[in-house]
């Protein structure tokens, strides 16, 4: 198994519910280390740019509106097989289909307000991390 970095967003619905700490604790208990984290209020331009791959899909405008409706936490997580581990912790995109005990099953209310975003591949992680963080903002976590 290789040490990887992945990208995570704690979305506006979860921030509004004050479950930032509970979600981050789940990452850490699963062996993922936070190597960068910040709270940001996305502009329409930033949200549209981040989700540009979905720009032709019917839900794009609603997604951008939701992601700009309140602050989010953007994080870089590091650990063994971080991309897959984060995806497993999040659960299915639709919280009604998410396994019990996953972040989305516990904190999300709908497929639209589904608490978290996580990279789906190492390539996506690299692109998403670079979208929000400079190399100097990523901290080595040796211990």
UniProtKB/Swiss-Prot annotation:
Record key words, sorted: ATP-binding, Cytoplasm, Kinase, Magnesium, Metal-binding, Nucleotide metabolism, Nucleotide-binding, Phosphoprotein, Transferase
UniProt-annotated catalytic positions: 117 (pros-phosphohistidine intermediate)
Quaternary structure and partners: Homotetramer.
Domain of life per record: Bacteria
Enzyme Commission number: 2.7.4.6
GO terms, molecular function: ATP binding; metal ion binding; nucleoside diphosphate kinase activity
Subcellular location: Cytoplasm
Pfam families the UniProt entry points to: NDK
UniProt function note: Major role in the synthesis of nucleoside triphosphates other than ATP. The ATP gamma phosphate is transferred to the NDP beta phosphate via a ping-pong mechanism, using a phosphorylated active-site intermediate.
One of the record's GO cellular component terms: cytoplasm
Protein name in UniProt: Nucleoside diphosphate kinase
Residue positions binding ATP: 11, 59, 87, 93, 104, 114
EC primary class: transferase
Cross-referenced NCBIfam families: PRK00668.1 (NF001908)
Any Gene Ontology biological process: CTP biosynthetic process
InterPro entries to which the protein is assigned, alphabetical: NDK-like_dom, NDK-like_dom_sf, Nucleoside_diP_kinase, Nucleoside_diP_kinase_AS
Cofactor: Mg(2+)
Natural source organism: Ectopseudomonas mendocina (strain ymp)
Annotated family: Belongs to the NDK family.
């Amino acid at each position: 198994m290789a040490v990887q970095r992945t990208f995570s967003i704690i979305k506006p619905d979860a921030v509004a519910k004050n479950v930032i700490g509970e979600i981050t604790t789940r990452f850490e208990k699963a062996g993922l280390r936070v190597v960068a984290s910040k709270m940001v209020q996305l502009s329409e331009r930033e949200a549209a740019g981040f989700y540009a791959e979905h720009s032709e899909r019917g839900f794009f405008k609603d997604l951008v509106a939701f992601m700009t409706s309140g602050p989010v936490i953007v994080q870089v997580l590091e650990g063994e097989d971080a991309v897959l581990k984060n995806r497993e912790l999040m659960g299915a995109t639709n919280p009604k289909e998410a396994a019990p005990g996953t972040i989305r099953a516990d904190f999300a209310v709908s497929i639209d307000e589904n608490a978290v975003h996580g990279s789906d591949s190492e390539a996506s992680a690299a692109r998403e991390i670079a979208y929000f963080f400079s190399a100097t903002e990523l901290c080595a976590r040796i211990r």
